[in-house]
Each structure stands twice: as C-alpha cells, then as structure tokens.
Curated annotation (Swiss-Prot):
Transit peptide location on this chain: 1-55
Quaternary structure, from the entry: F-type ATPases have 2 components, CF(1) - the catalytic core - and CF(0) - the membrane proton channel. CF(1) has five subunits: alpha(3), beta(3), gamma(1), delta(1), epsilon(1). CF(0) has four main subunits: a, b, b' and c.
Bilayer topology term: Peripheral membrane protein
Protein's recorded name: ATP synthase gamma chain, chloroplastic
Encoding gene per record: ATPC
Length: 370
C-alpha cells in the first residue's frame, strides 16, 4: 500500500511538472491568451486567478454551522423586536386605565376620611386571625424569557413552605401556563387556574377578583396574597409579594404608583419610569347627603378597586415577561454574533491549513523527483 501511495504521489508530481496549468483554474487574459500560474506576468488575468482548494469535511461542517448561527441570529433579533412592540402595547394599556383608577382611589379616600373608624368594621377591611392563606401566583405562558418564570416559581415555593412551617394551611390560585404546569405536576393544592395570555383585560381580571372575593367572604381563606413580577427595567425585574385581601385603608389612600414608558434611541431600547402623585382624597362636605349609605358605597367600590389592582399587576407581569424576553433575545443575538466570529476564524484556519497541505504535497513531490 505504501508503494502505491508513493507511486501515486510521484505520478502527480511528474504531471505537475509537465503541465502545471492543469492544476489551477484561471481566467482568460486579454486577447484570449492564457498565462501559467508560475508566470511573472502582471496581467489582470494573473491577478484574478484563484487556486482550486479541496476542502475537507471539517471545513464544510464549520461553514454550514456558520450559516445556521447567522440564521438563528436573525430569528432572535426578530423576536426581540416583536417583544418590544408588545411592551409598548402593555404600556398603552396601563396608561389607558389611569384616569379611572385615580378617580376611584380619590373617592375611596374621601369616604374613608368622612366615615372615620366606622369604615374599619367592613369585612374586606377587617384583620382576622389567619389560619389559611390563598396564594395568587402570576407566571408567563411561554418560555425564552430568561429566569422570569423560574424566579417567580421559586418565590412561590419559598412562601408556601414558610407558611407551612408556621402551621398555616395554604392553597394556590395560578395564573399562567408555566406555573400551572409546574405546580400541578408536583401535587400542590390548587384552588383554581386562569390563563390570561399576553393581553389581559378587565373581564379576565373581574373573573379572578370574583373568585378571590368569594373565597375570602365565605371564610375558606383568611388572607389572599399576590405574588407577581414587578417591572423595574428592561434588564431587571423583581418577584414581589403583597397582601391583597384584607385591604389596608392606609395603603389604599397613601401608596403611590409608577408608570413606565418604553423609548428607543439609536436602535437601543430604554425605559423611563415616572412616579405618579398620590391621588388626593376627595373632600366631601359634612352636610353632603348621600343617596346610598356610605358603607354600601364603599362595599361597591372595594371590588372595583380589587379588580383594578389585579388588572394592573397582570399588565405589569406581562411587561416584565416581555422585557425579560427582549433581554434574553438580545443576549442570544450577541452570543450568536460572537460564535459566528469564532467559527469564521476557525474556518479560515482550516482553509489555510488545506492550502498549506496542498502546497507541501506539491513541493514534496517535486523534491522527490530531483
């Protein structure tokens, strides 16, 4: 076998010495003349001539992988832009609900101030001994959003175990497919599940608030806690927990709010957060006569307020999910670009190695004939 390999190499070298032009591809020179690859001519044909390089399987595999990585980068960039458009939509939805929310908060604050301590006897404002808690957990419906869902699930599990260690019974109301799938597979006590999608509306929030009110007023639960992801910026979000029911009159009348706005500059996205002023309680004169008893008015306002709070947290959770997806897709695009550069370098090295190997074979064959 070695003899045949050496004989083949010598035959190739002899053929190269006899007709070296046959081992190269070239373009015709001006006037139809041809030139040899070893010619010292400086004609355009000589400058445009390219040697035929036989690439090995490794180089071809690298080239195919470069193409695949570049196509993946295009997909991730498109997903980032889609997420940015949906964040703007969520932003507009939050701004659209602000006038009603501010007016409701102002009227409620005025009624609380007018009634004084009498309002604290309402069922939804009364603090009672807690023996069972309902956790409302908001997660996303899809993945590809970094640690958004996993952080929220870990927060819910930690709170569930904390209440269990304190001897407090606990069940869950789950919102979002990821959380539903996770907790159902692990056998957690689940009261009810909801799927709101990426465009939550007031009807969906109303269905959730009615379920929570019925649970609390019927005595099946002594407190309702809401776990959601607070939207901070495009690169940061915070799993948050708050007591949803019973209400705290002081929090309703004093707690501020924030509105986020997504802006773009030079192809980059930024978030501007504006802290809104607290809605001042409406001043009701002492001689004002209410057609209905103020207690009945407050009982009617509280479900509306709960509905608004749930809708707001749903919208904020959606914005956090989309922002996390934007950041995740941006990171994926950057990583794809870096990987494509490394693969291009590796491909060029493989190509250069193939050229060097061919030259060495030719030179070795020519030397063997001398």
């Amino acid at each position: 076998m070695k003899f045949f390999c050496v004989a083949g190499l010598l035959a190739s070298a002899a053929a190269f010495q006899a007709q070296p032009a046959a081992f190269t591809t070239y373009s015709p020179a001006v006037g139809g003349a041809t030139s040899n690859v070893f010619s010292e001519s400086s004609s355009p044909a000589h400058r445009n001539r390219r040697a035929t390089i036989v690439m090995d399987g490794k180089a071809n595999a690298i080239r195919d992988r470069i193409t695949s990585v570049k196509n993946t980068k295009k997909i991730t960039m498109a997903m980032k832009l889609v997420a940015a458009a949906k964040v703007r939509r969520a932003q507009d939805a939050v701004l659209a609900t602000r006038p009603f929310s501010e007016t409701l908060q102002s009227v409620f604050g005025g009624l609380i101030a007018r009634m004084g301590g009498e309002a604290l006897d309402l069922p939804l404002l009364t603090q009672r001994e807690v023996s069972k808690v309902t956790l409302v957990v908001i997660t996303g419906d899809r993945g590809l959003c970094g640690g958004y869902n996993s952080f929220m699930i870990k927060k819910a599990e930690a709170r569930f175990n904390e209440l269990k260690d304190q001897g407090v019974a606990c069940d869950m109301v789950l919102i979002g497919k990821k959380g539903i799938t996770y907790f159902q597979r692990r056998g957690y006590p689940i009261r009810k599940t909801f799927e709101t999608g990426q465009n939550p509306d007031s009807k969906q929030a109303l269905a959730i608030s009615e379920e929570l009110l019925n649970t609390y007023l019927s005595g099946e639960s002594d407190a309702v806690e809401l776990l959601y992801t607070k939207f901070i910026s495009l690169i940061a979000s915070s799993p948050s927990a708050r007591t949803l029911i019973p209400f705290s009159a002081s929090e309703i009348t004093q707690q501020g709010d924030e509105v986020f706005q997504l802006t773009s500059s030079g192809g980059d996205f930024e978030v501007e957060r504006t802290e809104l002023e607290v809605a001042e309680p409406q001043d009701f004169p002492n001689d004002m006569i209410f057609e209905q008893d103020p207690i009945q008015i407050i009982n009617s306002i509280l479900p509306l307020y709960l509905n608004g709070q749930i809708l707001r947290t749903l919208q904020e959770s959606v914005a956090s999910e989309l922002a996390a997806r934007m950041q995740s897709m941006q990171s994926a695009s950057d990583n794809a670009g870096d990987l494509a550069k490394r693969l291009s370098t590796e491909y060029n090295r493989a190509r250069q190695a193939a050229v060097t190997q061919e030259i060495l074979e030719i030179v070795s064959g020519a030397s063997a004939l001398e």
